[in-house]
Amino acid sequence: MSAHTRITRKTVTAIRSTKGIGSLVSLTAYSAPMAKLVHDVADVIIVGDSVGMVLYGMPDTLRVTLDMMIAHGAAVVRGAAQACVVVDLPFSTFQESPAQAYRSAARLLAETGAQAVKLEGGCEMTDTIRFLTERGIPVMAHVGLMPQQANAAGGFRAQGMDPLSAAQVFDAACAAERAGAFSVVIEGTAEALARHLTGTLTIPTIGIGASPACDGQVLVTEDMIGAFDAYTPRFVKRYADANAVMRDAIRQYAHDVRHRVFPEPAHCFGYGKPLQLADAGATV
């Protein structure tokens, strides 16, 4: 690539225009190094509040703060030159009122440089989504299994498995579209429901434990590469065992240090050359 070639970041408008064309690739990232690994492959990078569980060892996403999301979102934007970056609004930063959501979302976009925010919720979030989008804040909706509402839902359970639940998920997704959301994540739902929603909505659906018929798919990158093994959701396909590779490297490093194999001459400065000490006049 020429040094003068300009790399263009994918926009919210570009993501929305992919409806029915190809399949969107989405992954998570919480740091600049991970963002650099995935930005030229992923269409969308989601800086998820799953950072609390994956990086901080939290039992759920409820303890994640807005300041945490801003810090991680800014790092990802610095590392990702091409993908559209979407940052989660964490629990308790948007549910109180549309005005609260606006203040939180405005901070996220202003302080991270991200292109959009993502928020979880059903039909009760319709006014909030509309309030944000009418004020220039792009919103990715999130329906179905919503980790922030796991306590109320009785745990991390698949949604849309009965007629009432299916209707609630369907209505929430349709309401989000009408309110101006540019796309919607459908998580942990009955496959037939996700397929039906994808055929009904005019905005892209991004599935995670949903359906191959969705307009795109997303996984937590650490789940997908095998770098997070506290537990593995049913919908995750592991493409590598990064933890095994890292453990082997760590063990090899420890072995080399204990046996004085590392550092080698190539890792040292002036190895084997005599050193003259200016004050003492001695050579070491």
From Swiss-Prot:
InterPro entries: Pantoate_hydroxy_MeTrfase, Pyrv/PenolPyrv_kinase-like_dom, Pyrv_kinase-like_dom_sf. Its main location: cytoplasm. GO terms for molecular function: 3-methyl-2-oxobutanoate hydroxymethyltransferase activity; magnesium ion binding. The active site is at E187 (proton acceptor). Pathway: Cofactor biosynthesis; (R)-pantothenate biosynthesis; (R)-pantoate from 3-methyl-2-oxobutanoate: step 1/2. It comes from the Bacteria. Coiled coil: none annotated. Its EC number is 2.1.2.11. Its cofactor is Mg(2+). Keywords: Cytoplasm, Magnesium, Metal-binding, Pantothenate biosynthesis, Transferase. It catalyses: 3-methyl-2-oxobutanoate + (6R)-5,10-methylene-5,6,7,8-tetrahydrofolate + H2O = 2-dehydropantoate + (6S)-5,6,7,8-tetrahydrofolate. The keyword Transit peptide does not apply. One of its GO terms (cellular component) is cytoplasm. It is an enzyme of class 2 (transferase). 3-methyl-2-oxobutanoate binds at D49, S50, D88, K118. The keyword Transferase applies. Mg(2+) binds at D49, D88, E120. Binds 1 Mg(2+) ion per subunit. Belongs to the PanB family. HAMAP family: PanB. Homodecamer; pentamer of dimers. This is 3-methyl-2-oxobutanoate hydroxymethyltransferase 2. It comes from Burkholderia ambifaria (strain ATCC BAA-244 / DSM 16087 / CCUG 44356 / LMG 19182 / AMMD) (Burkholderia cepacia (strain AMMD)).
